[in-house]
């Protein structure tokens, strides 16, 4: 009985791999930017599973670029230091006092934890921040937010150099200001969107702690046109923390990203489900093509 069950499991695994092959072929050579949010990081096992997904993507010819957040970790350290976390319209208020803590957590703690997890999974990851090689240069986003930056200049050649050398870039969202070399905290989604736009990425995956964008009845929408997203923001269907994520998606599409997906990073193998299965995972936003595609690929159809 045990042998029969093992055989069935092996057959199912082999079938899954076989069905994934056309999607792996489609994405070979593609640039996929993955925003790994603090809320999606979970425990060490969740981190290890995410790292294995990223290494597999690299192994099959994708160029994954990881941009991460770290809000819960920042809140935790600020709390230990007796500093209150404040937010305006869902964005962190970053004072001169807290920006050093933010940089320490993002660049020194979270970034290196992700790099180590990817390396432990057999990949070759390199951790950098938006400051390195002037990758991201910012202006103040909003006077109410303090040292929170909005990227205005991007130099992504360092990212291309890394992934073309077989490395996996892992980017902490802190950046240099246009004036006086001030340090700015950049919202993780904003940073990922700006990086994806500058790279003209094939996919931007925004991993979060919800299943995707929901309609008025609470159902997750698996595919959306940008005009539909704008209408849902205007009528209040998209609200709260989903507004900045969908606005990031729209801006990234305007800047040349082929498609954006908002998906639940807590789901095991979420990135692989999105890229290598017929129905994907989460909410896909793009201007053309439906979510559900036939298994048989048309000659010359990139499918991205």
Swiss-Prot record:
Domain of life: Bacteria
Keyword Disulfide bond carried by entry: no
GO biological processes: arginine biosynthetic process via ornithine; L-arginine biosynthetic process
Biological function: Catalyzes the ATP-dependent phosphorylation of N-acetyl-L-glutamate.
Record site: Transition state stabilizer: 35, 245
UniProt catalytic activity: N-acetyl-L-glutamate + ATP = N-acetyl-L-glutamyl 5-phosphate + ADP
Similarity comment text for this entry: Belongs to the acetylglutamate kinase family. ArgB subfamily.
GO molecular function annotation: acetylglutamate kinase activity; ATP binding
Pathway: Amino-acid biosynthesis; L-arginine biosynthesis; N(2)-acetyl-L-ornithine from L-glutamate: step 2/4
Catalytic activity, EC: 2.7.2.8
HAMAP family named among the record's database cross-references: ArgB
Location of the protein in the cell: Cytoplasm
Name of the top EC class for this enzyme: transferase
Alphabetically ordered keywords of this record: Amino-acid biosynthesis, Arginine biosynthesis, ATP-binding, Cytoplasm, Kinase, Nucleotide-binding, Transferase
Pfam families (UniProt xref): AA_kinase
Positions with a binding annotation for substrate: 70-71, 92, 185
InterPro entries linked: AceGlu_kinase-like_sf, AcgluKinase_fam, ArgB, Asp/Glu/Uridylate_kinase, NAGK-C
Official protein name in the record: Acetylglutamate kinase
GO cellular component labels: cytoplasm
């Amino acid at each position: 009985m045990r042998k029969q069950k093992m055989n069935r499991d092996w057959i199912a695994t082999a079938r899954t791999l076989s069905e994934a092959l056309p999607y792996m072929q489609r994405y070979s050579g593609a640039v996929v930017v993955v925003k790994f949010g603090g809320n999606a990081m979970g425990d060490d096992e969740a981190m290890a599973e995410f790292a294995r997904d990223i290494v597999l993507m690299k192994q099959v010819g994708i160029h994954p670029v990881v941009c991460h957040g770290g809000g819960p970790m920042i809140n935790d350290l600020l709390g230990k230091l007796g500093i209150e976390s404040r937010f305006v319209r869902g964005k962190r208020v970053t004072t001169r006092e807290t920006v050093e803590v933010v940089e320490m957590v993002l660049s020194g703690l979270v970034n290196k934890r992700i790099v180590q997890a990817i390396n432990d999974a057999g990949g070759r990851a390199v951790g950098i921040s938006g400051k390195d090689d002037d990758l991201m240069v910012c202006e103040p986003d909003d006077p109410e937010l303090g040292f929170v930056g909005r990227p205005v200049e991007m130099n992504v050649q360092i990212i291309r150099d890394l992934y073309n050398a077989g490395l996996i870039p892992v980017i902490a969202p802190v950046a240099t200001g246009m004036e006086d070399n001030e340090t700015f905290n950049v919202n993780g989604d904003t940073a990922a969107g700006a990086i994806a736009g500058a790279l003209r990425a094939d996919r931007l995956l925004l991993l979060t702690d919800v299943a995707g964008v929901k309609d008025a009845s609470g159902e997750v929408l698996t595919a959306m046109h940008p005009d539909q997203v704008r209408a849902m923001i205007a009528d209040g269907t998209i609200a709260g923390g989903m507004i900045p994520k969908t606005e990031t998606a729209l801006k990234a599409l305007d800047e040349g990203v082929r498609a954006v997906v908002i998906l639940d990073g807590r789901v095991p193998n979420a990135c692989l489900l999105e890229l290598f299965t017929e129905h994907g995972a989460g909410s896909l936003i793009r201007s053309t093509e439906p979510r559900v595609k036939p298994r048989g690929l048309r000659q010359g159809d990139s499918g991205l």
